[in-house]
Every structure is written in C-alpha cells, then in structure tokens.
Amino acid sequence: MKKKDNGKRVRFFIVYLLIYSYCMKKLKIGFTYDAKADYKLKPGESPDKIAEFDSEETLSEIEYSLKTSGHIIERIGNVHSLLKKVAQGKRWDLVFNIAEGIKGRNRESQVPAILELFDIPYSGSDALTMGATLDKAVAKIIVSNSGILTPKFLEIEDLSQLNKKKFHLKYPVIVKPSEEGTSKGIAQESIAHDFEHVRKRTKWLIEKYKQPALIEEFIIGSEFTVAVIENDPPLVLPPVQIAINNKTFLGENFYKHSCVFDDSIKYICPAEIPKSLDKKLRETSYNSYKALGIRDLGRFDFRVDKDNNPYFLECNPLPNLGLIDVFPLVSKAIGITYEEVICKILNSAIKRYGLDYTDF
C-alpha cells in the first residue's frame, strides 16, 4: 500500500512541476554589451580604446548567470547591433545592459538613450547618470554637494588654464583623464610633486585623449572599492581592500590597470579594517549611490587617509561583472553565489519597472 501511495505522490509531483513550468511567466531578456572581439584596432591605435570591453569568457559567465533566472536570454551585442535589431522591429521585455560605448563622452549613455526612445525597459542607470559619472569632475561636484568628501581638484581643458601662481592644490597631486574608466591614462608617472611635472603630464593627457585633464590632490593611504546593487533599499556589499605587492597601506602607490596583468594586485574581502571604517565606507557608498542617481548596480572607488577618512574618487555605473573582478568575492562574503548576484541585479531592474514575472 505504501509503495502505491509513494508512486501516486511522485506522479502528482511530476504533474505539478509540468503544470508550474507551463504556466509560469518567463520574460524575454536582451543582453547588450561591447565585446573585445567585435572591434579591430587600426594601426597606431592604443589598446586603451577597447580596455573596458569584455572578453567572450566574461560574457559567457554573465549569460550563464542570467539564464539561471529561468528567463529567456538573447544576445544583442553593441549599440550598432541594437539599432539594427530595433529597426527590424525586435523588442524585449527588458534589456540587461553592460555596453560601454566606443566614442565620445556620452558613449555610456548611448544604449540607455536608445532603449528609452523606444520605450524598452533596461537594467542599470539612465543616460543622464551615465554621462554624469563618466565625467569625473561632474561626479565629484555632485557628491561634494551632498556632503561627501572628495579630494580637491582642477579640471583643465587647455594648457593655458594652468597658472603656477594660481595653482592652489597641495602636492602630491595625480593627473588623469577626466572622462575615462578602467584606469586609462593613469600610471605611476601620473603622480606629481611639482608644477613642471603637472604641466608636462597635463599636456600629454590632453593631446593623447583629446579631453580635459583632472588634477586632484592625491590621498596618501589605502584604497578600497565598494559595490552596491538593488534599489529599495540599495544593498551595500562588503568593502574590498586593494593590496599591491601584498601591502594594504599603499602610500603613493595606487590601483593601475597594469597591476591586473602583472599579478601585483590582490583584492581582500572582507577587508581587515576597523568596524568604524567599514561603516564609513558603506555609508559613503550608499549616499553616493543616491546622490548620483545610480540604479540596480554601481561600484565606488575610495582612498582612505591616515585618519580613516574615505575620499570619493569615482563611481562606475557599469562595473566589470566578470569572475576576474570583485563580484565573486563580495558574493562569497555575504553567503550567496556569483550567479545569484547577477540575478539580483536583473530582478532589481525587473521590479523597478513593475514587470509581471515569476521570481525563480
């Protein structure tokens, strides 16, 4: 009798699963991105141009994670591919966007602007926020007006604006492109201790990147990055401390893109820091997220001085989501998988639009 009852229960459970699978709501999710393989550098072009773009390995990791949500995932590709598909009448319930764009200071705004134009929901921040955060000077002004500490700075569009007598920043300073990410244009030579070095580096940056140079007081100390996801309320993930050559007090050293390739960089999460500093970093990240109008995900970079004061450096609303970056570390620190973090970002956007779906 027991065997018959068990058999009935198994059959009932199988039928239940089949009915549930048939009835549950699945969304059609588009996936926009910039792949390194889609762009061929012309002779003389710097690898910097595609430094922010993703490898096929990273794209596959994200795509797999999105598929674990149970929704239907369709690769779209870059902004040009998106335009073609939209012109052909293609539509999606929502687009998961990590596209960086290829040209101009509004490049990160291109995909969000197109999707808004065609009334297609998408993950991440809108075009206005993308533009504001790509311009480091604008982002610093916004957070500063919200009471958040950020190093004093100058933005120089033309070398004639640099005047030794009127130069009020304290040395050392760091000179970097105002409208770039992935540490483009930043090297140890970016640190300057005198005006002539500032002038030389500023001239080089303006000529190479065809954009303003940001000259900023350099905070001697340690370096952190903090990821934030979701919206109501935002979920601030554990701070990640950056160690270079096994040192957490970096002095005048700092994160550079070259560190990734020479294996000198190490991410420490959870960071081995006082609770008071952990709290400051989380609160400052939360407040920056709100002040800049970030949605669904963002990452914030800080320098921390000898008195444990965190200084906002920049915000990346399109942080690298691959396994080589900080997201696997922070997901492990809060007891969830990398795939679950990606799905949290997706579900955050879905809920923000009030889309009808089944939360798997």
Where are each of the predicted segments found?
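Active-site nucleotide/adenylate-binding loops and adjacent lid/helix of ATP-dependent enzymes
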Residues: 22, 27-32, 87-89, 131-214, ...
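Polybasic, lysine-rich low-complexity intrinsically disordered segments
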Residues: 2-4
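Hydrophobic beta-strand scaffold residues
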Residues: 73, 121-122, 150, 173, ...
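Phosphate-binding site of ATP-dependent enzymes
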Residues: 95, 195-276, 280-283, 306-311
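ATP-binding N-terminal substructure of ATP-dependent carboxylate-amine bond-forming enzymes
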Residues: 7-8, 13, 19-122, 128, ...
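ATP-dependent carboxylate activation and anion-phosphoryl transfer catalytic cores
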Residues: 144-147, 274-360
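Short acidic/His/Gly/Ser-rich catalytic and metal-binding motifs that mark active-site loops
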Residues: 38-42, 181-183, 324
